[in-house]
Amino acid sequence: MDRIVEIEKYSFDETYETSLRPSNFDGYIGQESIKKNLNVFIAAAKKRNECLDHILFSGPAGLGKTTLANIISYEMGANIKTTAAPMIEKSGDLAAILTNLSEGDILFIDEIHRLSPAIEEVLYPAMEDYRLDIIIGSGPAAQTIKIDLPKFTLIGATTRAGMLSNPLRDRFGMQFRLEFYKDSELALILQKAALKLNKTCEEKAALEIAKRSRSTPRIALRLLKRVRDFADVNDEEIITEKRANEALNSLGVNELGFDAMDLRYLELLTAAKQKPIGLASIAAALSEDENTIEDVIEPYLLANGYIERTAKGRIASAKSYSALKLNYEKTLFEE
């Protein structure tokens, strides 16, 4: 799905996002409660000369889980090794990663909910006892070899905390859920990022981009890059509200942050007249896979009250009808 408001990382974004990513808590905007607690835990671990306990970050994509992992690495003065669960296909893959860690290293696993049960079994003793149990052979002749590992901190990131097994989730001593950002926070992020791109972004322009960014920093930064293109073509060093509006309208992102796919989704639900539509039916109608709908399209709509998710399916709320400028008919239960 080729969308400018796509939340998943694009490969070409990696270098760009890294250059705009804050390296310490002083430069990190938002998630104040999480920052406050992490600062305490990091200071305590450094005072005791210990590794941090294992950390789990959950929440919608694009809110800064990877950024926080890198900041923790910086604040702890530790090396960080990054991977993603889909890349760990066999227990041997995980064993190779773990045995290459040094004392005090941080291992960051993105999409950790996608680890297979067999991989999780290898991870349990590594997290609890800093030990790797390797089974040699099979059947009655099988032997278990125990390998000691250096003490390390595992940081897991997930958009679906509910898909983690209880044994894995319980092994994380610190668990934080990242929340969507306020427009004012995103505007500050955008103005700081614009300076790194050798531009000045007016406050009104930053707020205009922010309110169309689905409360998500990754989307806000991606939109900023596209707005910058419009400014560059017009030889403008300052990004104005007028230029931001022109660029965003040209990109097909409306004032609510919806693009064509969001509008198709909401039109499908509102056309059902308050009858729930199942996920499989929505996926078929939109020609999208169910994971994309659950992980990319729905989180923002759910968080902002545009849709309701029931046991029977999805229902458009009154807010959706208003967004599409449609009349909303109350159900018998609402009257």
From Swiss-Prot:
Annotated segments matching region Large ATPase domain (RuvB-L): 1-181
One Gene Ontology cellular component term attached to this UniProt record is: Holliday junction resolvase complex
Q: List the InterPro entries.
A: AAA+_ATPase, AAA_lid_4, DNA_helicase_Holl-junc_RuvB, P-loop_NTPase, RuvB-like_N, RuvB_C, WH-like_DNA-bd_sf, WH_DNA-bd_sf
Q: Does the keyword Disulfide bond apply?
A: no
Q: What is its main location?
A: cytoplasm
**Where is ATP bound in this sequence?**
L20, R21, G62, K65, T66, T67, E128, D129, Y130, R171, Y181, R218
Q: Where is this region: Head domain (RuvB-H)?
A: 255-335
| Reactions catalysed, as given in the entry | ATP + H2O = ADP + phosphate + H(+)
A Gene Ontology molecular function term of the record = ATP hydrolysis activity
Task: Kindly report, in one word, the top-level EC class recorded for this enzyme.
Answer: hydrolase
Q: What is its EC number?
A: 3.6.4.-
Keyword flag Oxidoreductase:
no
Q: Where are the transmembrane segments?
A: none
Domain commentary: Has 3 domains, the large (RuvB-L) and small ATPase (RuvB-S) domains and the C-terminal head (RuvB-H) domain. The head domain binds DNA, while the ATPase domains jointly bind ATP, ADP or are empty depending on the state of the subunit in the translocation cycle. During a single DNA translocation step the structure of each domain remains the same, but their relative positions change.
Assembly and binders: Homohexamer. Forms an RuvA(8)-RuvB(12)-Holliday junction (HJ) complex. HJ DNA is sandwiched between 2 RuvA tetramers; dsDNA enters through RuvA and exits via RuvB. An RuvB hexamer assembles on each DNA strand where it exits the tetramer. Each RuvB hexamer is contacted by two RuvA subunits (via domain III) on 2 adjacent RuvB subunits; this complex drives branch migration. In the full resolvosome a probable DNA-RuvA(4)-RuvB(12)-RuvC(2) complex forms which resolves the HJ.
User: What is the protein name stated in its UniProt record?
Assistant: Holliday junction branch migration complex subunit RuvB
Which species is this UniProt entry from?
Answer: Campylobacter jejuni subsp. jejuni serotype O:6 (strain 81116 / NCTC 11828)
